[in-house]
Structures are given as C-alpha cells and as structure tokens.
Amino acid sequence: MSPSKQCLVWGYVILSAAVCALVMAEEGPLIADMDTVFHKPPVDEKTRQPKGTCELVEGRFGKAVKFSFTTDSGGFFTGWRNPTANWDEYAGFSFWVKGDGSKTFGCLELIDGEDYGKRYGVPFSLADTEWRKVTVPWCDVIPEIPKGDLVDVRDGYKPSAFRNLWVGKFYYWRHYPQQSFCIDEIRLEKSIPVETKYCTPEVPGVARVVEKLKAGRPVTIVTMGDSLTDFNHWANKPVAWPKLLVEGLKKRYPNAEIALVNPAIGGTQLSQNLILMEQNVVPHKPDLVTVCFGYNDYDGGMRKAQWVKFLRFGVDRIRRLTEGRADVLLLTTCPAATRWEEMKELSEGAREVAAGKKTGLADVEAAFLKAGAGNKERLYCSDKVHLGPEGHALVAETVLDALK
C-alpha cells in the first residue's frame, strides 16, 4: 500500500474513533445494561408459582433480558436501582425493546424508594419484532394514582427519588394474553425534545369536530372514562351515555359518519388512562376525545389544586399524542346521590382548565344538581353511585348540548 493510501486509511480510522468517542460522550449514563438478570417474576398467590420468566438472550448490545408472561397472568417483574442526584440533571431516559409482534403493550414502572403509593408508568408497544429505541422525557413518566405528583425536576417529583424499576403490565389493562418482550440498555438522556406546538389549539373548543359533523365527514369519538362510561360495567348494560350521544348526534346531523371508541375502564382514574392512551386512544386517530373522571380520583385523595394540574397535563398529552388532530371535551365530575356536592371542587377545577386550555366543556355536575334538586335518586341505579337510564340520558344530553 502506498504511503498516501496508508495515510487515508489511518485518517479514516482516527476519524471513526473520534466520532464514536463523541457519540459515547453524548450518551447519558446507564441505568441498567441488562447484561444480567436482576428482576424477580410475579408469583401467583394461590399456586405460589411464577407467572412468568425472565432470561438472558442476545441483545441489541451484548445481552438483553427477555420477559415472558403466561396466559391470564399480569403483574410486574420486580427489580431495584440506586439513582443518584444527577438523575435530576437529565431530560429523561431511553431503552431498547424488541416485541413479540402482538397488539399488547408492556410497561416499565418506576417507584419511589420510600412510598409505594408514588409509582409511575411508562407503556410501550410490542408490535415491532426488531429492536427499537424508546425515548421517554420525564414529563411522560406518569403517576398511576394521586399520591404521586407529576415528574418535574423544578417543582414536581424528582427522578432521583426513584428506587424501583419494575417490568410488566398493569392490572387495569383488563386483558392478560400471553406475551413476551426483550429489554436492553436503559440509560439516561441529556436532551429529549418535547413537542409543545399542539398544546395551544388554533381553533378553540370543539368547533372543528362540529364542522365535520355538519359536513357529513367521518368523525371518530373516543370516550375516556371510568365505570360511568365503561360499557362492561353492570349498571351500563341496559343503556350507556356514549351510545345515546351518538344517537343524538345522528339525529342532529343525519349525514354524519360517526365511529365510537369507548376504552373506559371501571375503577380507574384519570392518570391511569393517560398512561394507557398510546394503546387505547392514539391508534384510533380521534377527532374528539371526551374526558369523564373524578369519583375514583376523589376517593384516591385528589383535590382541586392537584386536579387542575393533572387535567392540564391530560389535555396537553391528548393534544400532543394526537398531534393536534383531536378536539378535547372535558366533563365536570358527575355527582353521586350519596356524594351530591362533596366533589364540587373537582368540577370547579375542570371549568378552570377548560377555560384556560380552550377545550370544550360539558357541565355534567350543573345539569345533575339542577335536574336532581327534587329527587336525585331517580338519576341513579340501586347503589346511588352509578347511573340509571335517566342519568345516562342526562349526561348524553349535556354532552350533546356542548357539541353545538
């Protein structure tokens, strides 16, 4: 080889090494290299047998850990990490995942070192059977219950307080099919861009979806909610307000093509459903997302100041994940006959958020307090919490009035 070619080769080697060194320098520190198994599988309480397995396999970088669940089993593989204060200096974290090609989702769960009530979820799709990188800003590490504040290194929950790193799927995902996935290299990320341009809509309220309905264009409505909305709840078998809403819209707009998607899950709270959005909302490309929560949240300790904070975050998350496509309609918290005015502060918070974030608003609380002034029990089923036919009709009418 001539001296000039040798110089070119060595120059290429040196340049490549410099590029690699630069890339490595820009990478954040590892949280877990996943070259060893440090998680323990969940155990069935009755049989005391593990609900799944975790094993080493070939990874994206060296080895990785494969997590497998048996059919009809949920829960989490438990594991621990010891973060340092410098976690708070990073924008979030990333990990590599290889799915099983199914439509199900896996989840990372980060839990506070001293209080299990402060636990946070990060869902991920298992659709890809090739390695892909998932990047998560701290703001998208979402508290599962009201005890946890939103993650914010400035004035919220600080990532350096996490101690547990669990892998699995949530109990409230309802379905527990067999699934498996591989995880490799979980590491901190110095910079993660968060798109905020969709958080402030060009057209406020629900004007866009109303125009589509008037024009007879296809419209998809997703109704996020708890047992007051869930089609699977026993109280909603005879009638449910989302179906009555669609019937009312079709009468008002005879040419409208309306698809209804109802991912509501009884017993859940707003934050849990925000975690599940990538599975239950985003794939449907909704034109309208209705948000109906409050009773379970209040039971969990949610009060106005925190409710306002979570609702604002929820509206932004819906707009971000739907890339501004979806109009958002907030429903004020529906009273219960046994809790008639106790949750008014949550409804006050919803009104404030709707005005500030320029969403639509269906004031369900005001409608119920007015209609039930003389005989509120008629709006409910036997437990005086869940809705009877008249209650469902009133919610549907209130939402319909908001879509004018």
Give the role of each language-model region.
Residues 10-21:
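Bacterial N-terminal signal peptides
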Residues 25-47, 197-202:
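Extracellular carbohydrate-recognition regions
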Residues 53-75:
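Short carbohydrate-recognition loop motifs
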Residues 70-151, 176-182:
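Extracellular ligand-binding interfaces
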Residues 95, 136, 165, 170, ...:
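Extracellular beta-strand elements of beta-rich domains used
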Residues 114-117, 240-259, 268, 272-404:
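Alpha-helical cap/lid subdomain in secreted, periplasmic
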Residues 159, 173-189:
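Extracellular carbohydrate recognition
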Residues 198-263, 276-285:
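Serine-esterase "nucleophile elbow" of acetyl-processing enzymes
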